[in-house]
Design a protein with these regions (language model features):
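NAD(P)+-binding Rossmann beta1-loop-alpha1 motif at the extreme N-terminus of oxidoreductases
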Residues: 1-60, 67-73, 79, 83-89
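Generic structural signal for well-ordered, non-membrane alpha-helical segments
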Residues: 14, 18, 40, 101, ...
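Internal alpha-helical scaffold of NAD(P)-dependent oxidoreductase catalytic cores
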Residues: 21, 111-112, 141-151, 168-255
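Short, conserved active-site loop motifs that form the nucleotide-linked donor/cofactor pocket
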Residues: 65-67, 193
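Rossmann-like NAD(P)(H) cofactor-binding subdomain of soluble oxidoreductases
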Residues: 68-74, 86-168, 184-186
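NAD(P)-dependent Rossmann-like dehydrogenase/reductase catalytic/cofactor-binding core
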Residues: 218-222, 247-357
Length: 357
């Protein structure tokens, strides 16, 4: 059943997650109210003809209501026209790795200019970018070209394959504007997907970035067969590192116990579908990083995010030993055995993150 309060939604990026979200939203939408654009024009043409994304989700047929675009300009123009003719909030959803956010936002700004009534932008990306201007969060990358657009992050524990299959999940819609967060959450909420609103964009973005780095550490522990105790310790102490850094950034403490941090951390650190965890498992087995990434077939954001998070921690004087360990493994500056021993040999400290770094 369609939701009359939901406006047109255009998902920009036909990877696994962008496709899965499009399929989910289109199952409950009126025809052509949910659209999917693919950067690869040949892929878009195949998807439009075969009604499936054979590259990323070959077993998931597209709902009849889903419209596929090969031209970004045409997709954006059609979306704007449909927003003007419908009630409800119209959403552009940027489903690209962090590295692609700014170019895509710039293309949107060039094609559409300032937002019109009931137009807004979301992103699915999780990470922290190293740029000539410094370390930039997804919000920074999007806000540059789209400064006047209402915007926010849709984040939380969500394996694309499970969302595409219609299995239940719960996500967070975070924005610096709590009112917009609630509006956008309602626009995405429904069916097998629950969406909660949050006004803590800082904490939500940090949680999404940190969990990818910590999942690499959890994967290393699993690859070494260190046991469930070690995995639980890494997840818990990794959460403590996230909370310490979040406190220095002004995030709300409760965010780190929610879906955007703890929920996503548990999923990514334990699930077999986690790309970052698979990177850690392969590192533990001695596989070179370049070989791991070439065989992955998808972007593992934790690889590029780890050194950025380490730099952020150093800038704020926050100790992040697990993040540091992951960086050493990724750079090849230390062996797995050496990194593990360094973590175990650290002096005992108070567990309360406010009592000791």
């Amino acid at each position: 059943m369609s939701d009359p309060t939901r406006g047109p939604i255009l998902v920009l990026g036909a990877g696994a997650w962008g496709t899965a979200l499009s399929v989910h939203l289109a199952r409950r939408a009126q025809p052509n109210m949910v659209s999917l654009w693919a950067r690869d024009a040949a892929l878009a043409e195949r998807m439009a003809h075969n009604r499936v994304n054979s590259r990323y989700l070959p077993e998931i047929p597209f709902p009849e209501a889903l419209l596929v675009w090969a031209s970004l300009e045409d997709a954006l123009a059609s979306w704007r026209s449909r927003v003007a003719g419908q009630d409800g909030l119209g959403l552009l959803v940027l489903a690209t790795p962090v590295s692609g956010l700014r170019p895509l936002a710039e293309a949107i700004a060039k094609a559409l200019g300032p937002p019109k009534d009931r137009e807004a932008v979301l992103w699915l990306s999780k990470g922290l970018a190293v740029t000539p201007e410094g370390l930039l969060w997804p919000n920074d990358l999007v806000a540059g070209p789209l400064v006047s657009w209402p915007r926010g992050a849709l984040t939380g524990p969500s394996f694309a394959q499970e969302v595409a299959r219609g299995l239940p999940c719960a996500l967070t819609l975070a924005s610096t504007d709590p009112v917009f967060a609630r509006q956008a959450a309602r626009a995405c909420h429904g069916g097998s997907m629950r969406v909660y609103a949050s006004g803590d964009l800082v904490g939500a973005q940090l949680g999404g970035a940190m969990k990818n780095v910590l999942a690499i550490a959890a994967g290393v522990a699993d690859g070494l067969a260190l046991g469930a105790n070690a995995r639980a310790a890494l997840i818990t102490r990794g959460l403590a590192e996230t909370a310490r850094l979040g406190q220095s950034l002004g995030a709300q403490p409760q965010t780190f116990l929610g879906l955007a941090t703890l929920g996503d951390l548990i999923l990514t650190s334990t699930g077999d579908l986690s790309r970052n965890r698979r990177v850690g498992i392969a590192l533990a087995k001695g596989q070179p990083l370049a070989e791991i990434l070439s065989g992955l077939g998808h972007v593992a954001e934790g690889v590029s995010t780890a050194p950025a998070i380490r730099s952020l921690g150093q800038a704020h004087g926050v100790s992040l030993p697990i993040v540091q360990a992951v960086c050493q493994l990724l750079s090849g500056s230390a062996s797995v055995a050496m990194v593990l021993q360094e973590l175990l040999d650290r002096d005992p400290v108070d567990e309360d993150p406010s009592a000791h770094p």
